[in-house]
Regions:
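Residues at the starts of beta-strands that form the adenosine-phosphate
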Residues: 77-78, 102-105, 179
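C-terminal functional extensions of proteins
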Residues: 108-114, 121-211
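Structural motif
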Residues: 78-80, 160-161
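Short amphipathic alpha-helical segments and helix-helix/interface helices
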Residues: 70, 93-97, 119, 152-153, ...
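Loop/helix-junction capping segments adjacent to catalytic residues or to phosphate/diphosphate-binding pockets
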Residues: 63, 89-90, 113-116
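Histidine-anchored nucleotide/phosphate-binding helix
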Residues: 82-105
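Electropositive, gly/pro-rich neighborhoods at or near active sites that engage anionic ligands
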Residues: 1-76
C-alpha cells in the first residue's frame, strides 16, 4: 500500500526538486521527508496527508551540513545506501539519481521485519532500474553487522561512503567507525537524547568515520 502511494506522489515531488534552486539539497530533504512513511509511527497515514507532509518537509531546513555531504558524495567511487521503510524507498530515487557514477549498492533487509524494506519492495519501487540492490542477510530492525551476510559486509567494508536512512540504522550504526552519513527524522526520546536534536528534527549527521 505504501509503495503504491509513494509512486503516485513521486512525480509531483520530483517536479518540485527539479525546479528548486538546489536540486541536491531538495533531494536530500525529500529522502528525509520520506521517513514519515513508517507503519510503526504513522500506520494510518492517508495519501493526501503524506503529500502535504512531504511538500511541507521540502521547506524544512535540515539539521546538518548538506554541503559537506555533497562534498563527500562527489569523489566517492563506491557507495552503499542503506534502506529503511518499504514505502519511503520510492523517495530515495531522486537522491540516488544525483549520486556519481561508480559502484552503488542499495541494501534492504534480508527478511521482513516491521515495515522495513526487503528485496520485493525495492523491485516494486523501481530501485533496481537505478542501482544494484542487495540484501543484508538479516531480519533485525536496523543494521546489526554481526547478523549480516558476507555480500553485505563486503559492500559495507569496501564503501567510500555509506548513506544510512532511518532511526533504526542510526541506532545500530552510530558507534561504528565507518564513513557514514545518517539521514533520518528524530521520532523518539531515545534518539532525541543520543543525537542531541529535538523530536521532529530532519537530521543529516556525519558518522565517526569522518574526521
Amino acid at each position: 500500500r505504501f509503495t503504491a502511494m509513494a509512486l503516485d506522489l513521486l512525480p509531483s515531488l520530483e517536479a518540485r526538486i527539479e525546479s528548486s534552486a538546489d536540486p541536491f539539497d531538495a533531494a536530500v530533504r525529500l529522502a528525509i521527508a520520506g521517513n514519515i512513511i513508517d507503519l510503526g509511527v504513522d500506520g494510518d497515514l492517508s495519501e493526501e496527508e503524506a503529500l502535504r507532509a512531504m511538500e511541507e518537509a521540502l521547506d524544512i531546513p535540515v539539521a546538518g551540513d548538506v554541503k559537506a555531504f555533497s562534498e563527500a558524495v562527489r569523489p566517492a567511487q563506491s557507495i552503499l545506501y542503506l534502506a529503511d521503510n518499504a514505502g519511503e524507498i520510492v523517495f530515495d530515487r531522486p537522491l540516488l539519481r544525483t549520486l556519481p557514477g561508480g559502484r552503488i549498492a542499495f541494501a534492504v533487509r534480508g527478511a521482513p521485519v516491521i515495515n522495513d524494506a526487503v528485496m520485493r519492495d525495492a523491485l516494486a519501487a523501481g530501485i533496481d532500474g537505478l542501482v544494484t540492490v542487495i540484501d543484508n542477510g538479516s531480519d533485525a530492525p536496523g543494521t546489526i553487522l554481526e547478523d549480516c551476510g558476507d555480500e553485505f559486509l563486503e559492500a559495507f567494508g569496501g564503501a567510500d561512503l555509506i548513506i544510512s536512512k532511518g532511526q533504526g540504522n542510526y541506532e545500530t550504526l552510530c558507534d561504528e567507525d565507518a564513513p557514514i552519513f545518517f539521514l533520518f527524522k528524530v521520532k523518539c526520546p531515545a534518539v532525541e537524547r543520543h543525537s542531541g536534536l529535538p523530536l521532529g528534527t530532519h537530521a543529516l549527521l556525519r558518522g565517526r568515520g569522518f574526521s
